[in-house]
Amino acid sequence: MGVTSENVAEKYGITRDQQDAMAIRSHSRAAAAQASGRFKDEIVPVPTKVKDADGELHEVVIDQDDGIRPSISMASLAKLPAVFKKGGSTTPGNASQVSDGAAA
């Protein structure tokens, strides 16, 4: 998917700044939607156990998209390197997550 992003950006003249700005808008909108409960019917709460720093197990419920980054900025995105093509413009901050998906 990252290489395709690079190819599309090159073909249509989409700059790194444009990609970063869109990433900020997307995460901001997603954060607002999640905060207002718009995703509640799309995310099934999953109880699980996690270990804390001391190795203690705690039960938690995963009920939100953890990929939303509401605090990203142009400055923070500018620090990330292109990862799919040398001299490219697609970074971990403006690309789609590779961890998306679920199984039932």
Predicted regions and their residues:
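Conserved thiamine diphosphate
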Residues: 1-24
